[in-house]
């Protein structure tokens, strides 16, 4: 319940900015993983704005194309990064080229697929808004949707494909880290939906914030790995499902879930037993009260 309360309050606070940036009226993203990166985006974006000359690095995905030509295209970046990963894995030339083409295809197709999602869901959102206005006397209601709606944004694609090899290399050499992200890399796109509304699509800011949050996330995953592994082993023992099986001598983790700031804070609070849970309960109630006061104030305007 604490996790849900944290997330719902954050999505209420961020909904207007999200809707204006993505041009998705009445829609918000309540997923904990996406919302947990918003505090980093707010803090670091303000720090960047305080650095003299940093504003000159205001390059979005379109600016990247103009500056680097065809090399700035997400499709070409996907091919290059995919081929480099294949080369680093010491694959043969055929597999290197196949991986490059596959990564490029992903970068090209994701925006097209998400555009279809948006076209299909917009009428539902509009009708729901009409129903809310009729039944709830015009009160403002945000409709929670999947972040898959917006992961096709060009800046998200560029930042994701660049950070995949970078975070793999960092994970190997990062002191104290015991987690190597592999399958979790598929969730890289979901890191950015709530970062972009604050960086305004600036590729440089987005890359730096993404890198910092991922590095911190590696430590979160390492810290939670023992209990994550225990839970997976218990599921495997009860169900026999090989998807939950972690081989002996290994620990499991998930960068696309366990690196969540909200999840880690709640995990640490629960580990403190009654004291931690009491603190979480107080914070949850306080956030509920503050959010209600904000909503009432907005409705009076």
Residue ranges of model-derived segments:
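Juxtamembrane inter-helical linkers in multi-pass membrane proteins
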Residues: 17-61, 112, 116-146, 232-239
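Transmembrane alpha-helical segments and their short flanking loops
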Residues: 15-31, 94, 131-138, 178-301
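Short, small-residue-biased leader/transition segments that mark boundaries at the very start
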Residues: 2-8
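Alpha-helical transmembrane segments and their membrane-interface junctions
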Residues: 79-88, 154-173
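Hydrophobic alpha-helical membrane-embedded segments
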Residues: 9-17, 104-123, 210, 214, ...
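Long, internal scaffold/assembly segments composed of regular secondary structure
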Residues: 61-111
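Short juxtamembrane and helix-loop transition motifs at transmembrane-helix boundaries
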Residues: 57-66, 139-151, 164-177
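Transmembrane helical segments that form the transport core of multi-pass membrane transport proteins
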Residues: 89-154, 158, 179-182
């Amino acid at each position: 319940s604490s996790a849900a309360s944290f997330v719902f309050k954050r999505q209420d606070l961020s909904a207007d900015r999200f809707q204006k940036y993505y041009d998705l009226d009445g829609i918000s993203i309540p997923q904990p993983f996406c919302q947990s990166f918003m505090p980093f985006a707010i803090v670091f974006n303000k720090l960047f704005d305080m650095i003299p000359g940093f504003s000159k690095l205001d390059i979005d995905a379109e600016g990247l194309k103009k500056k680097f030509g065809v090399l700035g295209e997400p499709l070409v970046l996907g091919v290059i990064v995919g081929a480099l990963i294949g080369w680093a894995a010491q694959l043969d030339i055929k597999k290197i080229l196949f991986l490059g083409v596959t990564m490029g295809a992903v970068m090209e197709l994701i925006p097209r697929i998400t555009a279809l999602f948006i076209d299909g869901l917009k009428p539902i959102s509009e009708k729901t808004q009409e129903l809310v206005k009729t039944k709830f006397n015009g009160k403002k209601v945000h409709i929670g949707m999947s972040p898959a709606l917006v992961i096709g944004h060009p800046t998200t694609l560029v930042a994701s494909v660049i950070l995949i090899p970078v975070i793999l290399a960092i994970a190997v050499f990062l002191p104290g880290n015991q987690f190597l992200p592999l399958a979790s890399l598929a969730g890289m796109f979901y890191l950015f939906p709530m970062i972009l509304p604050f960086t305004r699509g600036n590729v440089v800011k987005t890359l730096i914030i993404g890198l910092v949050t991922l590095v911190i996330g590696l430590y979160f995953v390492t810290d939670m790995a023992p209990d994550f592994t225990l839970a997976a082993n218990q599921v495997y023992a009860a169900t026999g499902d090989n998807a939950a099986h972690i081989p002996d001598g290994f620990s499991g983790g998930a960068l696309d879930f366990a690196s969540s700031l909200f999840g880690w804070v709640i995990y640490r609070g629960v580990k403190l037993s009654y004291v931690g849970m009491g603190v979480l309960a107080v914070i949850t109630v306080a956030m509920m009260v503050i959010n209600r006061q904000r909503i009432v104030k907005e409705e009076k305007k």
